[in-house]
Amino acid sequence: MTLDKKATLLDVKIYQASGDVGIDSHAFIMANGVKYDYIGSKQLPKGVFVKVPECGYVAATLRFKPMPESTTEFDFRETADNSGWNIYGVRLDGKRPQANIPQHLLQQALDKNSKLPSTDLNLGKTVVAVRLLGYKPEYKTTLDIIADNWFSPYRMPYEHDSISVDGTCQVSANAILPTVATIRVNRTEIPFLAVPNDTTTVTIDLPTLTLAATHLFANDANVKNYVWFEGKHAAIDTELQSVKTKIDVFGVTSFDDICGMTPLQYRDYVQQSYERLLTAINSNAAIGSATRTLAQSILSMNYASALFGFKNNISMAPMIAGKRGVPRADMSIDTVSYFKPLEKLAVLHSKNQRYYSYLRDFTSSLRRKYISADPLLDDIAVGKRLSRSFNRKRPLTEQQMAAAHDSIANDMVRELLFANNEDLKSQLASADNILAEVKKSANQNSTFSIIDIDPKMSAEQILPTITDRYKGKAVLIDLWNTWCMPCRAAMSAIRPLKEQMTDVVYVYIADASSPVGKWGEMIKAISGVHVRLTKEQADALAELYKFSGIPTYFVVNKEGKITYQKTSFPGVEKLKEQLMSAMQ
């Protein structure tokens, strides 16, 4: 940064994998309670989007109204409502933002000889108490707890109360076995061992975590330690942080690599990744035997799951990687030879498989051929089938309850299913009250509105019902959810376009997988028309219009006809081009 008498100059690098970037014309710097407006930039002129080059970032010098030369700290805010890029507490005195870490955590002595908890069934609540040091409500920090217990929605965050003003939040979830769960703060994932009838206390240094998530400081050794655990398994939880990138054999970046692969090429790729990661875990001297066993078990189960999922992963790779023209691979395989490596996978014949959060994935007939016989899997399979309605926010019917009594042999497995059912009922009752408050707020607000859609409305009727009221205008429909990070990133990129094309109607459609409380808070900062569907309606809409992911966009012309459809963000210029055409 340069503090000049005529302007404040801020040198920036904006990282993005692809597409276009721009700076909101309402951006400003805040220092000592005074606002300094954005003047412009040669590299990123107001209202202009710049394509991200192959290097993955755009470098620019942003000009703001002049700040006093005595300024030592400032906030960069792209929008006043915190919906854009926001960077808080930037220091100009050479010091880094710091939180006050309690002394007992800094002096914490961890037991390297900690033992893993038993894999015997033990039904109860797992409680997570989180404290964010250095937290301020205006930061709009997102916090999710992801803990799977077989009969909960797949990798979906648990609903929880808002983060308190002091940065604390507590959530409890039903649990029957110790498994690796995840705390997600903004985009940073923190794994920990969620154990039934146990409480884990987690303290997070938010300023340091935020620095560690940036390109500038990602490899800085001084920002590696930002989380402390307290509880019976604090040592294991702490050590997990050093191997958290080693326990998933198939990450998002892998989709680039596997585009166009045959099943055998894919198997070899996954196997090589597994062996490389396993070697890294085994050679990590910073972890004890318990953490090593846990990491080996989770990695091995993920490896097996990746092999079984070859068809889906290869098919989805081009879309996820954003590559066009990739020829479809022949998916036929010789099952016996293809899955032969699994015959030597020890975890499939060990109770350590129970540490795997997604053990329910191994209840299919194909996967059961390679895993030791266990009556527990039979009960999980029944519960999995009965709990499918939970994904659609529907409690069990009386008939389903009776089927559970008749078909699930293990009492604790049955009670876990029923406990999830009761939790869902409570959530729905609470959600109705929250939704009523959100609608009330929308009626009093001029920047966003809500359209009610009958939960029984068919997929064929949904889009026409929404767009018919806007005939004579072009409409951009954005299908998203609160948990979809690419969706949210795209919204930020589109914001300046919305300022330019004010005659367009912007419609945002989410479904019941978005916690209603979080959805209600987020839409306050997303100007436009908002719609909330049931999960069944969202699935039916995807089937009708033949798309399999989000974000998905529709452009509707003045006559109410869909003229453009795209899954994954196509870039600002493409949307602008399609909207201009729809306005003709």
Feature locations, PLM:
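Short, solvent-exposed, Trp/other aromatic-anchored flexible loops in extracytoplasmic proteins
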Residues: 39-73, 78-81
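A non-transmembrane, solvent-exposed segment enriched in polar/low-complexity residues
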Residues: 91-289
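Oxidative protein folding and maturation machinery
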Residues: 123, 206-472
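Conserved redox-active cysteine motifs that mediate thiol-disulfide chemistry
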Residues: 479-496
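Thiol-based oxidoreductase modules, predominantly thioredoxin-like and allied folds used
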Residues: 503-518, 525-538
